[in-house]
Amino acid sequence: MAALKASKKRKAVTRDVEEEAGVFSGDELSSKDLDGALSDNAHDLLSDEDASDSEIELIDDYSSSEEEDDEELDSDEIPSEGEDEGVVKKKSTAVLDLDGLEDREESTKEEEEEEQLNYRIEKDANGNDRYVYDEINPDDNSDYSDVDENSNTIGNIPLSFYDQYPHIGYDINGKKILRPAKGEALDALLDSIEIPKGWTGLTDPSTGKPLELSQDELELLRKVQMNEIPDEEYNPYEPLTEWFTTEKEIMPLSAAPEPKRRFVPSKHEAKRVMKIVKAIREGRILPFKPQTQEDEEDKDVIKYDLWADEAERPDHPMHVPAPKLPPPGYEESYHPPPEYLPDKKERKAWEDADPEDREREFLPQDFGSLRRVPGYENFVKEKFERCLDLYLAPRVRRSKLNIDPESLLPKLPSPEELKPFPTACAAVFRGHKGRVRSLAVDPTGIWLATGGDDGTVRVWELITGRQLWSVKLGEDEPVNVVRWRPGKDAVILAAAAGDDIFLAVPPIADPETEKASLDLLDAGWGYAASKPAPKPADEEKKSTPPQWIRPSAALADSGVCVVIPLRYIAKTISWHRRGDYFVTVCSGASTPASVAIAIHTVSKHLTQYPFRRRIKGGGPPQTAHFHPSKPILFVANQRTIRAYDLSRQLLVKIVQPGARWISSFDIHPTSATAAGGDNLIVGSYDRRLLWHDLELSQRPYKTLRYHRKAIRAVKFHPGGRYPLFADASDDGSLQIFHGNVTGDMLSNATIVPLKVLRGHKITGELGVLDIDWHPREAWCVSAGADGTCRLWM
């Protein structure tokens, strides 16, 4: 067989052979001599005897063999090594395989050596022939190793099967291996004291003797224990061979354009999908395979969860979790907003600064798309510093207070517990043409006075909504404000229309009250007559106080008694609690600062200008009110509210609401009496309602933002009987609040939203323009830009 393999291996070599003198003598070889030099696959499969006796023959039909070989190679199968042996191709002439002759002689010698017998024939006890083979001596190339003659050959059988026998198995020759004798306890003690090298304390199950390790096994265990490489021939520090990156390829492997089939859906796949869809529709393919009997049987198998009873291991008492990294911001985005990108000046300042002084470790950049983002150069450094912080920096556990946010909010009472307050519209007052700019309820709570863009002042009966009196004060000028004189001893109505202030006594009261009202207004004429007449030069000055005059005959017949020419349009009127003084504010931008605020005395028919210069900061004045119990005048401009002591002529306090433009404010009626301090509410055109506690701070105590448009008017309930206040807004709604003020200095005011009242229509971007309360009931009246007034109960 060895000769056959050698001959086959030699025949696989196909190369051109040069002619040698020792092989050819110049004569041509006969076909008999060349038999076997060029053999096909059939000759390769001959036996050893045929191979040794084969002759050399010439291959006449070489072209046919080439065609057969070509046909075999044209197939999809790759010819094996055995099929390629002996196949010789030449375009012009056939080549003689002369090396085959030399190999043939060598194979003949090897076959003769193999023919030597490795056994002998002996006679057995019956006289028959018995073959006795010689022992095999393995060389270095053999896979067999020396077999220990005393080794146990019972295989993978437990030794407990031999417990009742005196032996424990058989050796390679079939002889019994006797059980080793066991030593006494003293011998075992001595063996444990004098431990030999390689002692393990275990028993070899195959021999029953103590198991001892060899020197090689001990060395292997030592290397494993020392974390060394067991194989001595292995080199862990071999030079790195970069198979794919050694040479940089500049040109692409293939520059062919992408074929169209890469972008067009495959028609063959579509056909296959349609076949599957058709099969599913016909029922030949079931998309949801029903459960088989085996699956149903698996349900009966009891399955156990290995981790069902696993208990979570508690953390170490000293364990402190690592703090989390802060989340990334907009500046770390690959496409940050433009305001986060630095300009040239900021970039240069960052580059010139020391790394320790820089605010951040990088500059925000805009890459446009994520695929253009390069590697971050400080990534490894930041991770290393993070590891150092986790490893070296001490950690502190800070316990957080688990406080319910709802518990921090004040306990507000339910609105149902705070009744009465207005909830619905009870009456609608119609009669004005255009917007109703102002309204006021008289101190008795019986009559309602209104003024509008049509220049008329109307008095209504509050309960029934019936109009009782009306007077037209101007043709083209609207009535900006109407206010009743406080007190029940007289019925005097002040109205501002155009540049004049009108004081009227409507004929609606009883004769005694009406006569007392007329006498109160007529008493000032005598005081005015006793004063010296002003000079013509002084009358031309703008800062000269105006002289009170009598109205025209038509107005006098209508009930108007006094006219005060201010020369500027007055926007607000506010009476003093005693009814002898009232203050007017001309908030126009063209009004001089010296005449913007005027205080009028009814008993003397006297007008005074307390401010000679404009109030600092905040623009022109907007409105003014007297304190309900102190000689203090509050004046509000666009941004601040100032409190002046009229008796001492000093600035007492400056209130800073923080609003952009103050529209109105009101003072709590019980300020400085039961409450122990002054409380204000301020409305602004920037949709904010602010509550001020002047004893607490100059800043707002509460800021309420419930309206969608500007707030036009705010008002406390007069008298302090009901802790209510309301505001009116251009969004067409009124909001009613509960505002309780106590005399306890340790408690603050309680503010509770109660009701939102809607009914006025928004006309010309204007909604509710004014609001007032009934003096005794929890009723309020509102004036709207839609030309109506509404009574809310």
Curated annotation (Swiss-Prot):
Acidic residues bias spans: 47-85, 99-116, 136-149
GO MF terms listed in the record are: ribonucleoprotein complex binding
Query: How would you summarize the oligomeric state and partners of this protein?
Result: Component of the NOP7 complex, composed of erb1, nop7 and ytm1. The complex is held together by erb1, which interacts with nop7 via its N-terminal domain and with ytm1 via a high-affinity interaction between the seven-bladed beta-propeller domains of the 2 proteins. The NOP7 complex associates with the 66S pre-ribosome.
Which keywords does UniProt give here? Nucleus, Repeat, Ribosome biogenesis, rRNA processing, WD repeat
Record field: compositional bias (Basic residues): 1-12
Basic and acidic residues bias locations: 29-46, 120-133
Record's protein name: Ribosome biogenesis protein erb1
What SMART domains does the record tag this protein with?
A: BOP1NT (SM01035), WD40 (SM00320)
Does the keyword field hold Methyltransferase? no
List the subcellular locations. Nucleus, Nucleolus; Nucleus, Nucleoplasm
Extract the InterPro entries matched here.
BOP1/Erb1, BOP1_N_dom, WD40/YVTN_repeat-like_dom_sf, WD40_repeat_CS, WD40_repeat_dom_sf, WD40_rpt
Which residue ranges have biased composition labelled Pro residues? 323-340
Please indicate if the UniProt record lists Magnesium as a keyword: no
| Gene Ontology terms: cellular component | nucleoplasm; PeBoW complex; preribosome, large subunit precursor
The segments carrying the WD repeats are 431-470, 474-519, 616-654, 657-702, 706-747, 763-793
Any one Gene Ontology biological process term?
maturation of LSU-rRNA from tricistronic rRNA transcript (SSU-rRNA, 5.8S rRNA, LSU-rRNA)
Q: What is its main location?
A: nucleus
User: Which family does the record claim for this protein?
Assistant: Belongs to the WD repeat BOP1/ERB1 family.
User: Which portions of the sequence form the region Disordered?
Assistant: 1-150, 312-349
What role does it play?
A: Component of the NOP7 complex, which is required for maturation of the 25S and 5.8S ribosomal RNAs and formation of the 60S ribosome.
